[in-house]
């Protein structure tokens, strides 16, 4: 090895280290300070207590998370576990830099352009570092950051193996890769998608090149992929069920002996195969942590996989139902029975022909759904977010790419120009021109970690959240091509120049330009949106929801976001452990019902036998009145609550969760207070509205329908907030202790609202929608006071809401709610606040014609602001005339308006004309009023009312 080669290797490693430090600093500075929404609360809690999370479990992540939770770097356990993500994500970027170098070296192995190779790789890796999805994963506790690292590590190792193929110890790389893949099964099955890429790199390195062998290699790789998934991941538990633990142990011992024998006998291929399988199994053995801990019954023990049959169900993700590639799950996909009829045999199994008919039912709809939703919206849009830009699809300059008006589309201007995308596309062409084998291998990796997932998952619409985090490995693969594109572009520029000095100068200039316009521009553009500093919304909402509940309550929650953060507070922070958090989705499962019964058997609220629980299922139901016993008092003299219960499933049945809610209400017999979180859907509240009393972030079940809200508790919770006031206006990390003294692990009224009024703290639209639950509470409290003629308290509630979360920082997504706020302000005499909200309303992008008319009338009737009403109705009138002209010239289709919509416009026109006339009249704009009325009368000569108005204007003008 030459001196220059040694020096360049050291420089390469040094740059990789610097990349780690830079990216870690960025990720750490933007890291979530505590628990976040979605799965993070569950993962942090289960890591800390070594519990059992939702299938398929991610045991390796839990073990690493447990280690980090023990490092005393913060009093906040979530902060400790969170810090692993910035570390592992920064390591991923360092590996990506090395991988880019490997691919460029395979195109140009000379040392002449080593500097430019490294800087091209540096720019590409930093570009990926600051893409949306990778950065999102890097700042919270989730498996995807760790999974991305494992993918990068496997790619790096197989590329290193191909470089060392002539060394005597090259096989160790393949063995190590097998172990990493085994370990990665304890994270996410996404890592298995690298296997076809690995197979192709091996084939192109040592195989005899032919189309037949290439196809066989790819097929063999897929066999290995499904073999690991079916034989090892799913098969070992089934094998254990057949052989028992003793039999399985004996089989493993035999395998170890055979492996040792093959190594000593120099049977190379056999030894590699046996060693690889053994190491995959050893890596996979992290799942023993899940099964062992489940047997010890931790407080979070999802699916209870402590027996072999339950473990098999857990690994198969049976909880989520059967996954099928066909048919694609387009909207209104008919049921299988409605298409192919009842099952053909006596065992309720559909025949092969029936399955085939259903798979290929309505191919045009399937194809349309596959492209328009699953590929275009749920992958291509995400891909373009990374390298072109992300923005509100309601913006006229943002391409929707399948997104609805309240979702993010593709903002081609976010990074100035989509240079990263252009360089990546150039890199693909350059790669295929210079090294078709590597390019094809990389293309397979790109497709397997992107489009192939789309085909396999067959997601239905709509999804509860954006799913871009699942395709980060695909985006990382594209970033390798960005590095190749930069390198090829620099070579093209320098090759076009004659003098060497000019070549060097131009190369340095181009590198500087790329660094400036790609990673730096992306860093600046994405920083605020990915900065979680000061974001305590999940922690605070969980705390506030728990503190809404009286001691020893039962709290029904809806899904991940109103359950996992609560689990975190209870299991990790030990806050309000007396509250029973009963997740409605999980109440559909027998294991969860059994766990709730056993965990709280000292003060039971589920009095069901094992047989009753196991027989739980849907119940056919027709709407009818039902009753449950209730305490007798002055508000309830009959001693029961009665209400009409409607079907909740397809209009014909009650779900298991509904039956369990009814059973819990009955068995509890009013011993424990029962609450429904405000996030629970109306359907899941089972029409109990008349007996649900709002107390903050939860509705309490009461025995009467006299009051829809509890004013005293609402005021105590919403208006008597705890913590230092500075939290609302500024973020100061030195004030942690002030807040910590005020929170209570026991029942205490008073909410926390940290940083909701701090413009420096980014609140994404989804979080913005979640915190509207606070606003709803404030508004309902205010309206309650208003109806009781207590106008001072009504106004005070709204003013406190404005102080805590001003609409200028966290917009009000519901126009109906904001109009209610404006109306209450008007009712209490605060015209300035009313006008402020009305002006915000008319600037919204989601308004319909009737909204503009309503708001314009409000400016006239309640605010007497004729300048504003004039602007509104002039705009509406001009739009009417433009639409009319367009329809006359181009027709309805080209104008993109339906005949029904045009009829609505025509029916509204007289009112628009009249309200615009009123605005002109009160502003003494008589000329404009005359022109308006004359134009109307010319088209409607029989309108005597308009003629009277015109006469009125003429009289006013003459006087």
What does each of the following model-derived ranges do?
Residues 2, 101-107, 134, 139-148, ...:
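ER/secretory pathway lumenal C-terminal domains and tails of membrane proteins involved
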Residues 31-43, 53-64, 301-303, 533-537:
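Extracytoplasmic catalytic/substrate-binding loops of multi-pass membrane glycan-assembly enzymes
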């Amino acid at each position: 090895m030459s001196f220059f080669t040694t020096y360049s290797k050291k420089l390469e490693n040094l740059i990789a280290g610097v990349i780690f430090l830079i990216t870690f600093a960025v990720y750490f500075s933007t890291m979530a300070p505590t628990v976040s929404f979605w799965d993070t609360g569950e993962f942090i809690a289960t890591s800390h207590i070594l519990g059992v999370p939702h299938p398929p479990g991610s045991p390796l992540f839990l073990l690493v998370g447990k280690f980090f939770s023990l490092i005393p770097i913060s009093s906040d356990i979530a902060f400790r576990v969170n810090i692993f993500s910035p570390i592992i994500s920064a390591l991923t970027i360092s590996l990506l830099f090395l991988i880019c170098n490997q691919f460029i070296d395979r195109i140009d192995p000379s040392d002449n352009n080593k500097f430019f190779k490294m800087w091209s790789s540096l720019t590409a890796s930093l570009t990926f570092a600051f893409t949306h999805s990778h950065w999102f994963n890097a700042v919270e506790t989730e498996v995807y950051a760790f999974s991305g690292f494992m993918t990068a590590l496997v790619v790096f190792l197989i590329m290193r193996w191909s470089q060392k193929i002539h060394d005597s110890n090259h096989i160790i790389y393949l063995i190590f890769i097998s172990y990493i893949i085994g370990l990665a099964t304890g994270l996410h099955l996404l890592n298995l998608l690298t296997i076809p890429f690995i197979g192709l790199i091996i084939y192109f390195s040592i195989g005899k090149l032919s189309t037949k062998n290439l196809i066989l290699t790819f097929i063999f790789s897929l066999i290995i992929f499904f073999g690991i998934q079916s034989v090892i991941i799913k098969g070992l538990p089934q094998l254990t069920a057949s052989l028992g633990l003793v039999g399985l142990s004996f089989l493993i011992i035999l395998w170890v002996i055979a492996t040792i024998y093959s190594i000593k006998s120099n049977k190379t291929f056999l030894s590699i195969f046996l060693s690889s399988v053994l190491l995959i199994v050893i890596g996979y053995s992290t799942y023993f942590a899940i099964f062992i801990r489940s047997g010890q019954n931790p407080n979070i023990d999802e699916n209870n996989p402590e027996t072999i049959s339950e473990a098999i169900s857990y690994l198969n993700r049976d909880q989520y139902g059967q996954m099928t590639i066909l048919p694609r799950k387009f909207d209104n996909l008919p049921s299988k029975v409605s298409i192919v009829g009842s099952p053909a045999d006596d065992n309720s199994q559909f025949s092969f022909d029936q399955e085939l008919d259903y798979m290929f039912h309505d191919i045009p709809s399937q194809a349309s759904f596959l492209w328009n939703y699953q590929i275009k919206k749920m992958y291509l849009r995400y891909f373009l977010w990374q390298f072109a830009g992300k923005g509100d699809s309601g913006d006229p300059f943002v391409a929707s790419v399948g997104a609805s008006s309240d979702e993010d589309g593709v903002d081609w201007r976010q990074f100035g120009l989509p240079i990263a995308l252009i360089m990546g596309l150039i890199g693909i062409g350059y790669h295929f021109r210079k090294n078709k084998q590597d390019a094809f291998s990389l293309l397979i990796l790109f497709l397997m970690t992107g489009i192939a997932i789309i085909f396999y998952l067959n997601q239905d619409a709509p999804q509860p959240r954006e799913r871009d985090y699942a395709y980060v490995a695909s985006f990382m693969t594209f970033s390798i091509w960005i590095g190749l594109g930069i390198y090829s572009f620099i070579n093209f520029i320098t090759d076009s120049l004659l003098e060497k000095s000019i070549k060097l100068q131009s190369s340095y200039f181009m590198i500087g330009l790329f660094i400036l316009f790609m990673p730096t521009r992306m860093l600046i553009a994405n920083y605020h949106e990915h900065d979680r500093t000061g974001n305590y919304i999940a922690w605070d909402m969980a705390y506030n929801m728990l503190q809404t509940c009286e001691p020893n309550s039962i709290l029904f929650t809806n899904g991940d976001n109103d359950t996992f953060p609560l689990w975190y507070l209870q299991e990790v922070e030990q806050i309000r452990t007396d509250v029973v958090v009963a997740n409605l989705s999980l109440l559909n499962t027998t294991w969860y019902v059994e766990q709730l019964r056993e965990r709280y058997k000292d003060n039971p609220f589920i009095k069901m036998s094992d047989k009753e629980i196991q027989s739980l299922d849907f119940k056919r139901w027709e709407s009818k009145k039902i009753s449950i016993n209730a305490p007798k008092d002055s508000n309830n003299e009959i001693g029961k609550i009665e209400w009409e219960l409607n079907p909740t499933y397809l209009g014909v049945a009650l779900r298991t969760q509904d039956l369990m809610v009814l059973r819990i209400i009955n068995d509890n017999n009013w011993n424990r207070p029962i609450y429904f979180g405000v996030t629970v859907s109306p359907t899941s509240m089972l029409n109990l509205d008349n007996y649900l009393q709002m107390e903050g972030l939860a509705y309490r079940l009461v025995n009467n329908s006299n009051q829809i809200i509890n004013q005293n508790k609402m005021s105590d919770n919403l208006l008597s907030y705890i913590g230092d006031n500075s939290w609302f206006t500024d973020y100061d990390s030195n004030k942690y202790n002030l807040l910590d003294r005020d929170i209570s692990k026991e029942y205490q009224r008073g909410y926390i609202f940290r940083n909701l009024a701090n413009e420096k703290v980014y609140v994404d639209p989804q979080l913005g929608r979640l915190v509207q639950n606070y606003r709803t509470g404030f508004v309902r409290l205010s309206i309650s006071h208003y109806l009781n003629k207590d106008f001072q308290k009504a106004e005070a509630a709204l003013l406190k809401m404005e102080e805590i979360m001003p609409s200028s920082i966290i917009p009000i997504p519901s126009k109906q709610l904001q109009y209610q706020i404006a109306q209450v302000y008007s009712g209490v005499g605060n015209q300035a606040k009313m006008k402020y909200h009305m002006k915000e309303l008319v600037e919204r992008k989601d308004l319909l014609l009737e909204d503009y008319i309503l708001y314009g009338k409000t400016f006239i009737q309640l605010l007497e602001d004729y300048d504003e009403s004039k602007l509104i109705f002039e705009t509406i009138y001009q739009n009417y005339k433009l639409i009319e002209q367009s329809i006359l010239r181009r027709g309805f289709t080209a104008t993109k308006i339906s005949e029904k919509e045009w009829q609505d416009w025509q029916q509204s026109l007289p009112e628009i004309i009249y309200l615009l006339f009123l605005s002109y009249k009160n502003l003494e704009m008589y000329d404009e009023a005359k022109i308006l009325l004359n134009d109307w009368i010319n088209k409607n000569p029989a309108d005597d009312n308009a003629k009277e108005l015109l006469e009125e204007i003429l009289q006013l003008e003459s006087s």
